[in-house]
């Protein structure tokens, strides 16, 4: 828990600039989430300015939600540039497994090297070649033990930190694995909440190593969701309260409400 508190403190002190190449559906949502937490967002995907923008950024988040051939070129190029410049990269392979194009582009980006891969059970399964576990951008049902094993297997296969999100979130770098129990089911009734997590992971990975960064993002967001639900029981007001609690969350709140533990297979 101490590393989560320290990571949040660093984000607010350093206000990292997070370069998001993300989808049209969530640009506003994720930018506001980053601002509420204390980071600085930029949403830019033009291929012509990628190198300049990435030089300015502290981390890069790639989200394939509204993918097309132009976005693919920008995303692959951004991954290559960020790696050359030593900037951490978060990949959110939205809808991988739903279409061959999404799966292929996600694997193409992964092959260049990313620091964090965050997706639901179906998306991560698809990237490992397991089909039939995705419906659109949503994951079909699975067991917690399956999710834990999938997270560790994917981390080892892709040599990166992997988060598999769900009722329980699992994070692994192939050696250590954390389970995060924070969150609320109403998140599933608001579009873009998974994309928010990817963006926040970008803020955290700018200030600490990937395993701690990803775990910190999931715990922070999960607590914010729980606290938001205490004050707003319906999706519209809940969405607004999420921003409020990303802004309000602090050391005392994390110490009181964090539900995270290291697990073994």
UniProtKB/Swiss-Prot annotation:
Pathway where this protein functions: Cofactor biosynthesis; thiamine diphosphate biosynthesis; 4-methyl-5-(2-phosphoethyl)-thiazole from 5-(2-hydroxyethyl)-4-methylthiazole: step 1/1
Essential cofactor(s): Mg(2+)
CDD domains documented for this protein: THZ_kinase
Catalysed conversion reaction: 5-(2-hydroxyethyl)-4-methylthiazole + ATP = 4-methyl-5-(2-phosphooxyethyl)-thiazole + ADP + H(+)
Positions bound to ATP: 118, 165
Enzyme Commission number(s) from the entry: 2.7.1.50
Keyword set includes Electron transport: no
InterPro entries: Hyethyz_kinase, Ribokinase-like
Thylakoid is among the record's keywords: no
MF GO annotations: ATP binding; hydroxyethylthiazole kinase activity; magnesium ion binding
Annotated binding of substrate, by residue: 43, 192
This protein's UniProt keywords: ATP-binding, Kinase, Magnesium, Metal-binding, Nucleotide-binding, Thiamine biosynthesis, Transferase
One GO BP: thiamine diphosphate biosynthetic process
HAMAP family in alphabetical order: Thz_kinase
Chain's role: Catalyzes the phosphorylation of the hydroxyl group of 4-methyl-5-beta-hydroxyethylthiazole (THZ).
Family: Belongs to the Thz kinase family.
This protein's name: Hydroxyethylthiazole kinase
Organism for this UniProt entry: Pyrococcus horikoshii (strain ATCC 700860 / DSM 12428 / JCM 9974 / NBRC 100139 / OT-3)
Lineage: Archaea, Methanobacteriati, Methanobacteriota, Thermococci, Thermococcales
